[in-house]
Amino acid sequence: MVTQRKDFSEKEIEAVWEKATKQPNNTPDVFRKDYAGAWIRREDYGKRDMPYGWEIDHLKPLAKDGTHDFDNLYPVHWRNNESKGDDYPRWKTVLSSEENRNVESEKKWKVDE
């Protein structure tokens, strides 16, 4: 069982960024959306002090036998990652978007295993 966080390489960060959803009329190398619909900005990786900061989330948390495998990694706005924590297979996110801005919006998620 993997229990330790890891520092991701720039190559890994870029590969996970590619999983974020591209949006029409936006520069996909700069802005995309996470799975909850929150805007994230590429250069704000790891920056919790930025409005579009994002992190790499382990969909199935390491604390629940998740792995660092690419299929388990997702780009997520830091507030959604913080809200999710180690919750799995059910969790909630707290941020989505309306047009070009992020807004408070609680959504519940569930993975069928």
Language-model features, listed with the residues they occupy:
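Short, Lys/Arg-enriched charge-dense amphipathic segments
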Residues: 15, 46-60, 93-95, 109-113
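Short cysteine-rich loop/turn motifs with clustered Cys
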Residues: 6-54, 77
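Glycine-rich short-loop/terminal segments
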Residues: 1-5
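Flexible domain-boundary/linker segments
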Residues: 33, 76, 90-94
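Polybasic, low-complexity binding patches
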Residues: 65-71, 82-113
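Histidine-centered catalytic micro-motifs used for acid/base chemistry in nuclease
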Residues: 51-64, 68-78
